[in-house]
Amino acid sequence: MDRKALESVAKHYPYLHLQGLYAIPAGLSWFLVGLSNLQRQPVKPLVLGAGALVGLGVFGVVALYYRNHFGSPTPTRSRQVRQYVALALGFAVFVGVDQLARTLLGRPPGQPVSSYAASWAVGMLVFYAIVGGLRTYHVVIWGSLFVAGVLPIWGLSVDRDAVASFPIGVATMASGIFDHYFLVRAFQSSKRQSLEHTNAGA
């Protein structure tokens, strides 16, 4: 299938937001956020810089992979709008839930829970629900993070939010890998249907 035909299929394909391998550098970014915010055992800037370079390198490899396998399509305007709305509402829910929890539990929360992790999980569920629909693995992964966030296992350390960045990073990468798997399977099916339609009209 040539590049133009590939991009024609991808342009109208509804799951391009599931280019989940981008979640690998995103997850690495969460690790860097956590490391950079540790107060009791701060990480040296050199380590953070090296981590950032690794993340950029991985991002470049992922971008090259998707360009070679899916082309460089421009999503339809309606799909772009939906993605922007999903991002905005997901982030707004994260901030709102986190601030509500801190208002009720104190700043920082007086209970050994992580409102940060739990709120981010809720925001991601909202994002996926809007942008393309929740799938079982979304509910399992982000639901598990939410449950972990509300369990009294976090202690009362000043590094609580920084530590929460690590499971958020793991959940991000896990969700992304499943997204990618779903994307590849469904896109191949869409591509076959497009080829069959083209051959039938020839």
Language-model region placement:
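N-terminal juxtamembrane cytosolic/stromal segments of multi-pass membrane proteins
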Residues: 1-21, 197-201
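Terminal transmembrane helical module of multi-pass membrane proteins
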Residues: 128-202
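Long, highly hydrophobic alpha-helical transmembrane signal-anchor segments
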Residues: 13, 24-39, 136-150
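Selected alpha-helical membrane-embedding segments in polytopic membrane proteins
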Residues: 24-105
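Membrane-proximal helix-loop-helix units in multi-pass membrane proteins
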Residues: 83-149
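Hydrophobic core segments of alpha-helical transmembrane domains in multi-pass membrane proteins
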Residues: 47-56, 112-123, 164-176
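Juxtamembrane membrane-water interface segments of multi-pass membrane proteins
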Residues: 8-11, 62-74, 186-198
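Membrane-interface helix-loop-helix junctions at boundaries between adjacent transmembrane segments
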Residues: 9-19, 41-49, 133-144
